[in-house]
């Protein structure tokens, strides 16, 4: 008996049966990650002009 083929068939069957579930938990995680990205982007928008100004003064 070839274990690799059996494992591949079982894995494929599990993906087909379990792949149709809702993405509730994953969606929540994605929303949190998106919020973190927005906060980092806004903070960098505020800090970047200050950093550029300090760099210009240092020349």
From Swiss-Prot:
<keyword id="KW-0732">Signal</keyword>
<dbReference type="InterPro" id="IPR000875">
    <property type="entry name" value="Cecropin"/>
</dbReference>
<dbReference type="GO" id="GO:0045087">
    <property type="term" value="P:innate immune response"/>
</dbReference>
<protein>
    <recommendedName>
        <fullName>Cecropin-A2</fullName>
    </recommendedName>
</protein>
<dbReference type="GO" id="GO:0050830">
    <property type="term" value="P:defense response to Gram-positive bacterium"/>
</dbReference>
<comment type="function">
    <text>Cecropins have lytic and antibacterial activity against several Gram-positive and Gram-negative bacteria.</text>
</comment>
<feature type="signal peptide">
    <location>
        <begin position="1"/>
        <end position="23"/>
    </location>
</feature>
<dbReference type="GO" id="GO:0005615">
    <property type="term" value="C:extracellular space"/>
</dbReference>
<dbReference type="InterPro" id="IPR020400">
    <property type="entry name" value="Cecropin_insect"/>
</dbReference>
<keyword id="KW-0391">Immunity</keyword>
<keyword id="KW-0929">Antimicrobial</keyword>
<comment type="similarity">
    <text>Belongs to the cecropin family.</text>
</comment>
<keyword id="KW-0399">Innate immunity</keyword>
<keyword id="KW-0044">Antibiotic</keyword>
<keyword id="KW-0964">Secreted</keyword>
<dbReference type="Pfam" id="PF00272">
    <property type="entry name" value="Cecropin"/>
</dbReference>
<dbReference type="GO" id="GO:0019731">
    <property type="term" value="P:antibacterial humoral response"/>
</dbReference>
<dbReference type="GO" id="GO:0050829">
    <property type="term" value="P:defense response to Gram-negative bacterium"/>
</dbReference>
């Amino acid at each position: 008996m070839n274990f690799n083929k059996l494992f591949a068939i079982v894995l494929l069957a599990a993906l087909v049966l379990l792949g149709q579930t809702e993405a509730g938990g994953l969606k929540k995680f994605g929303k949190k990650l998106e919020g973190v990205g927005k906060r980092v982007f806004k903070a960098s928008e505020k800090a970047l002009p200050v950093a550029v100004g300090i760099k210009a003064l240092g020349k």
